[in-house]
């Protein structure tokens, strides 16, 4: 329809709704998959999302980790832009490419790698567990990091 109306792909932003992992865990994977498909649907288009929606309803201390890991996952899936809380410095660092090791760890888990959890720092273990959670490989509970 866009082409019929003379609207070029590069003028279009896709903005799928990001639903909370706390209540719509399966929809988190749906948004990730949609981001992967945008490039096939309209190669020159752009994508955007309200990133922090993914952590709505989670305890405040866990929201930054959920947001940061989901950003890494969506970046891998082709995300072009995101509405984020600029006060979350680690999230901003991730977006600007200053958390490269964490980004690579998320991507390796997305690729199916099973890291040696005993050899990882606690922060890296939390990233692995959160990636698996957002991929739907474990069920959400406020205590997912303790399992």
Kindly label every feature range from the protein language model:
Residues 119-147:
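Terminal or standalone catalytic/regulatory effector modules within metabolic enzymes
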Residues 1-119:
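Catalytic alpha/beta core domains of metabolic enzymes, predominantly
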């Amino acid at each position: 329809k866009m082409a019929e109306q003379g609207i070029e792909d590069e003028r279009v932003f896709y903005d799928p709704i990001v639903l909370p992992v706390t209540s719509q865990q399966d929809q988190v994977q749906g948004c990730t998959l949609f981001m992967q498909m945008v490039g096939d649907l309209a190669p020159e288009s752009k994508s955007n999302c309200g990133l922090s929606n993914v952590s709505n309803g989670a305890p405040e201390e866990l929201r930054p980790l959920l947001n940061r890991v989901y950003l890494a996952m969506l970046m891998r899936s082709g995300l072009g832009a995101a509405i984020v809380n600029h006060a979350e410095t680690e999230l901003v660092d991730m977006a600007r490419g200053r958390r490269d090791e964490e980004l690579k760890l998320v991507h390796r888990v997305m690729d199916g790698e099973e890291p040696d959890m005993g050899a990882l720092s606690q922060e890296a273990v939390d990233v692995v567990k959160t990636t698996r959670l957002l991929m739907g490989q474990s069920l959400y509970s406020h205590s997912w990091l303790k399992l």
